[in-house]
Regions:
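Active-site activation/catalytic loop segments of kinase-like enzymes and analogous catalytic loops
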Residues: 229-263, 276-294
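Short beta-strand segments
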Residues: 43-47, 71-72, 134, 196-199, ...
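An alpha-helical support segment within catalytic cores of ATP-dependent transferases
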Residues: 2-17, 75, 108, 113, ...
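ATP-binding pocket architecture of kinase catalytic cores
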Residues: 25-147
Length: 321
């Protein structure tokens, strides 16, 4: 930002709505965005540019339980330029990863069941077109099929990866990955139509309060896609947890046992394998050589059956359906 909003300006915003500040904290959220926590009950998001798209994403899930609700939106005028803001309810609790060591296996399994119910409720919302891509759609409002969209997405990924200065052995892995995607694309033929996705659905965005599921945060990446795409990050985090002593298998096993609609898809393991390959390529394209040594071996593992290996461990039928 040209000039970050300071606490005095936060107080100006709160005064506009007769909010008395008793406790105020500043944190950095996703994508480096400045966030303020007010009275342990409200969350203030700010931006130099209009927040229309972000606010629309919160509004379209406003009828759901366990999500932040918009209270006020507006613009703060100042000499350094306007600041757009969104004031939301602050959900209670801490993210699953932060409190993982404090949870019992029974609580982890219950979280899996609760998340399955939450996803079924979320995926009842339908759209008219797919948004293809991870985090930020590479193809927004795509009018074709899910399979056609991914074929176009792979071509965009290939074009980007050709600009990267990859090692020769990495280029060989990338070529194998693109051949793998093309050869396996028939599994994407099955579709139920665009469903509303959180699209960054991993344990750091799930909250627990006193050991129980209390909400889902960070909806900035929300878009429309096939429901099984929502499982992409959960699979990734289970096989590659942020710390070696974090084991998400009990949680994920319970989620699959609850049989949410997003897991009742034919060829589920193969579809999730394609999504994982897309994810690794996308991250390397974005981060360059600094991600190459980490993610190229992961690419190989996915192609060599990483999802099948995980499903066997969880006793999940990878054929889905």
């Amino acid at each position: 930002m040209k000039k970050e909003i300071d606490l005095t300006e936060v107080r100006r915003i709160c005064a506009e709505y007769q909010i008395e500040i008793k406790d105020l904290k500043s944190i950095t959220g996703s994508f480096g965005k400045q966030i303020f926590l007010i009275n342990q009950a409200l969350l203030l998001r700010v931006s130099e540019t209009p927040m229309t798209l972000e606010q629309d994403k919160f509004r379209r899930v406003a009828t759901l339980d366990f999500v932040p609700k918009i209270i006020h939106t507006g613009v703060l005028q100042r000499e350094a330029g306007p600041i757009y803001y969104t004031l939301l309810t602050l959900l209670p609790g801490d993210d699953f990863i932060s409190v993982y060591r404090e949870t019992t296996e029974a609580q982890q399994r219950q979280l899996g069941r609760d998340i399955a119910v939450f996803l079924d409720t979320l995926h009842e919302f339908s759209g008219t077109a797919y948004d293809i891509g991870l985090y930020v759609p590479a193809l927004a409002h795509f009018s074709g099929t899910w399979r056609e969209g991914h074929h176009e997405y792979w071509e965009l990924l290939r074009q980007e990866s050709e600009k990267a200065h990859l090692r020769s052995e990495s280029i060989q892995v990338f070529e194998r990955a693109y051949r793998f995607l093309q050869a396996s694309s028939a599994v994407l033929e099955y579709q139920t139509g665009p469903k509303l996705l959180h699209n960054d659905f991993h344990p750091r965005n799930m909250l627990l309060h006193q050991g129980r599921f209390s909400g889902v945060i960070d909806w900035e990446c929300s878009q429309y896609g096939e429901a099984d795409f929502e499982l992409c990050h959960l699979i990734h985090w289970c096989l590659y947890p942020p710390k070696p002593d974090i084991d998400l298998r009990e949680f994920l096993r319970a989620l699959f046992e609850a049989s949410p609609t997003c897991a009742q898809v034919p060829d589920l393991a193969q579809r999730l394998t394609l999504y994982q390959i897309e994810h690794e390529i996308q991250q390397i394209n974005w981060q360059g050589s600094e991600a190459e040594s980490l993610r190229v071996p992961r690419l190989v593992r996915w192609m060599d059956g990483g999802v099948d290996e995980l499903f066997a461990n969880l006793d999940v039928d990878g054929r889905g359906g």
